[in-house]
Amino acid sequence: MAWIEPEVTEKPKKPMFLCVLSSTKTAHIPKLSAAGKTAELTDYTPAGDAELMETGNIISVPVLPMTPPYDTPTPAIMTRSALKLTDAPYHFINSGLIVTPDVPCIDLKANPGEDIREPVAVMDVQGIYERAKLLAKRLRNQADHVVIGESIPGGTTTAMGVLMALGYNGNVSSSADENPLELKKQVVEEGMKASGLTFGCLKDDPMKAIACMGDPMMPAVAGLVAGFQDTDTSVVLAGGTQMAAVYALIKHMGLNTEKIAIATTRYVVEDKSANFIQLTTTLGVPVVYVADPGFGKSSMKGLHRYETGTIKEGAGAGGAMYLAGLFGITQDQFRTEVENVCKLLKAGH
C-alpha cells in the first residue's frame, strides 16, 4: 500500500499537533493493557511518551514505555520522528495524569480516571470539556489544521464502554498482539452494571457516558474539537478505536462532524480482532487516513514487531505520520528517522 491512504493533497498553512495525556485506573486491571511492562508501570507511560516526544528520551520516568513480551518501543517514537521532520508546532495537554512528565504541559486540572467498574469513572466531565474548549479558542488563531493524539493506557477498554453506552457494538483494538477482548467485555459489563446502564441507554447523554464508562482524555478531546468549531480549522483525530469512540461522543453531542477526519496506522485497520473500518463507516466518519511506516523494511527487530501486530497505535502515531505526509516526507525518510530515534534510545534492536 501507499505510505498514506487516501493520498494527502491539501497542505494547510498552519498545522498544529496536540497530544492529550491522561490516566485511568482501569489500566491497573491485570492483563488489560500492554502499554507498559506491568499494570502499575502503565501510570508512567503517558509521561514517558511526552518526554520522549519532546526530547528524544525519558527524563523523570524510571523506564522507557515498552510493550512486553519483546520490549517493542512505544509508538511515541513515530510521533517524535514526525515532529522532528516537520518542525510543526505542538502542545502536550495534561487531562488527569497520575504521573506528570518533566516537559511543558497545558494542565486542564482534571483528576485521573477511576476504574470503570466504580459508579463514577470520570469526575467533572463538563468542567474538563469547557476548559479544553476554552483552550482551543485560544489556539485557533495559531492553526488552520489540528491533529489531536492521545496517550492513555487502558483507553481501548474505556472506548468499548462508551461505545456500548451510546449503542455501538465496538470490538476495540489492543496494544498487545493477543487482544484480551473477553476480559475487556467482562470489565465493561461490570462497569455498566455498577452504573445501572444498559446497551445504548445513554445515546442522548454522551457526557454521562463519559462519566460512567469513559476516561479523562475523552472530554478533553471533545472540548478541543468544540473550541475549533465555527472556524476554518479542520481537525484530524489521531488514533484508532479510542478516537472512533471520541468521534461517536462528538456526534452524539450534536457537534458538526463534516470537517473531522480520523488518522490511524494500518496496524489498527488490519487488526482482525477489532472492527475499526466497520465502526467508522457506521459512525459516518468523512475520511479515515491510514498510514504505513513500512517497518517491514527496517533492520530493527523491535520495529518488525509492529508488522506482526505486537503494537499498533498510540501517542497520535497515525496522525503524526499523516502530518509528515502533509509536509511531503516520504516513507523511507520517515522510517530512517524512526531508526535514528531508536538508536539514540538504544531501543528496538
Curated annotation (Swiss-Prot):
CDD domains: DMB-PRT_CobT
InterPro entries: Nict_dMeBzImd_PRibTrfase, Nict_dMeBzImd_PRibTrfase_arc, Nict_dMeBzImd_PRibTrfase_sf
Alphabetical list of SUPFAM superfamilies matching this protein: Nicotinate mononucleotide:5,6-dimethylbenzimidazole phosphoribosyltransferase (CobT)
GO MF annotation terms: nicotinate-nucleotide-dimethylbenzimidazole phosphoribosyltransferase activity
TM segment ranges: none
Coiled-coil boundaries: none
Family matches, as PANTHER family: PTHR38811, UPF0284 PROTEIN SLL1500 (PTHR38811:SF1)
HAMAP family: UPF0284
Family, per entry: Belongs to the UPF0284 family.
Official protein name in the record: UPF0284 protein MM_0708
Originating species: Methanosarcina mazei (strain ATCC BAA-159 / DSM 3647 / Goe1 / Go1 / JCM 11833 / OCM 88) (Methanosarcina frisia)
